Amino acid sequence: MTPGEVRRLYFIIRTFLSYGLDELIPKMRITLPLRLWRYSLFWMPNRHKDKLLGERLRLALQELGPVWIKFGQMLSTRRDLFPPHIADQLALLQDKVAPFDGKLAKQQIEAAMGGLPVEAWFDDFEIKPLASASIAQVHTARLKSNGKEVVIKVIRPDILPVIKADLKLIYRLARWVPRLLPDGRRLRPTEVVREYEKTLIDELNLLRESANAIQLRRNFEDSPMLYIPEVYPDYCSEGMMVMERIYGIPVSDVATLEKNGTNMKLLAERGVQVFFTQVFRDSFFHADMHPGNIFVSYEHPENPKYIGIDCGIVGSLNKEDKRYLAENFIAFFNRDYRKVAELHVDSGWVPPDTNVEEFEFAIRTVCEPIFEKPLAEISFGHVLLNLFNTARRFNMEVQPQLVLLQKTLLYVEGVGRQLYPQLDLWKTAKPFLESWIKDQVGIPALVRAFKEKAPFWVEKMPELPELVYDSLRQGKYLQHSVDKIARELQSNHVRQGQSRYFLGIGATLVLSGTFLLVSRPEWGLMPGWLMAGGLIAWFVGWRKTR
């Protein structure tokens, strides 16, 4: 470690201790050497004994700065790892930091645009930022080319070295978690940090966010439910993004929405419909749909439309994940826990040797009490959370795409019930899920699959006769070679009849291995094993002739 890293690590540990976070470690895990090390190097009493543990953890992360704040925000969505009182406190972390100098932002924009002054591209550039966060800040302007109002998002200067330095230390601390916490291995701390690192590095590339926004805008073009502001790709780079400026009501401002005459029931239902449309129709969903990124258009309040911004984090599901997820929801609400258990095994989410009966019983034990509530009050997000927590006890591997989905679903539910407390998520989502599943089977699904594969088949059709001819010729050559060797073996008078069997098998295996080695290199070690087996059989046959 460099001296700078040592100083930073020392500050991190002292901060944790000043908030009494060593209480997280069971006393039996604090050995005498560790206790001596703690008091000799880090003498720091708990200065916040009047606060609960979750609040102390939140305040400590807030004090450590942007990288740790965003880490805490990500951890707040992993409710499979933390009890509710800690996850709820982490969710309160605010990604708000002091803005950097607007003149510096202007210099970055000019560098990204080839060194020309800002005035060559934009009018009315506002030096004071509209908003500021740990990764980037936003300025307003007008495009010189068409006069449209835009926002310019600029990455903070020199943020990457800071992020990499703190991530390196977070990895170091993560490796200590399994040694200090009794449940440390189950938490898989290194995997959690790796997931966070990927998300954070992705957020630093505004070209990626631009592409995500363009894709979402295309998916919901002319939709009455969701509007994504236009991105101007000619002005975008890794460190800068330019998009249409929007005016809307923050989705969390219920009073203003009601004052504007918004149809709150329809707005809440559309939030659920937008989410399931993204997941099941498009396989591409906005995975950062917290209230700060969602607005509602002022226009047509009786037919309200969402406006989505900040598309830096997105998720996607493959066709199998979507099918298993939809069937899991339907099986759960039908209380078919056997089906839920089998779906987890079939999908590969849990090992194939999982005892289905035990798994079914565990799911029933955890999920059956949920139905004590009225159906309208059941949370999809918590259903998924309960299923994941139960499956984790049966060695379910972390599924990053499902974690993102569960986090987003909790956001959607929270917003929907804030807008319209009587929102019945199951009633809203069930027709969509049943329709989607029905669409995946039967003749329509076969026709669609044929249409999807037809271009590939048409492209390969001219090559088909040659491929068939080559396969037949190679097979004929192999058979001819085997027959020839068999005839030669039969012409020899060996003293033991079994030698022919071994020699023939040996020759066949060697030739087969040679053929596969040349024509099918992707088969890996298989040709080698065949040739080795052939040589052994040949040797046994030769020995029998002695």
Swiss-Prot record:
Biological pathway: Cofactor biosynthesis; ubiquinone biosynthesis [regulation]
Parts forming coiled coils: none
Record keywords, A-Z: ATP-binding, Cell inner membrane, Cell membrane, Kinase, Membrane, Nucleotide-binding, Transferase, Transmembrane, Transmembrane helix, Ubiquinone biosynthesis
Binding of ATP, residues: 130-138, 153
Subcellular location as annotated: Cell inner membrane
GO BP, one annotated term: regulation of ubiquinone biosynthetic process
Transmembrane regions: 501-521, 522-542
EC number: 2.7.-.-
InterPro entries for this protein: ABC1_dom, Kinase-like_dom_sf, UbiB, UbiB_bact, UbiB_kinase
Domain Protein kinase: start-end pairs: 124-502
Molecular functions (GO terms): ATP binding; protein kinase activity
GO cellular component, one term: plasma membrane
Residues annotated as the enzyme's active site: 288 (proton acceptor)
Family that this chain belongs to: Belongs to the ABC1 family. UbiB subfamily.
The name this protein goes by in its record: Probable protein kinase UbiB
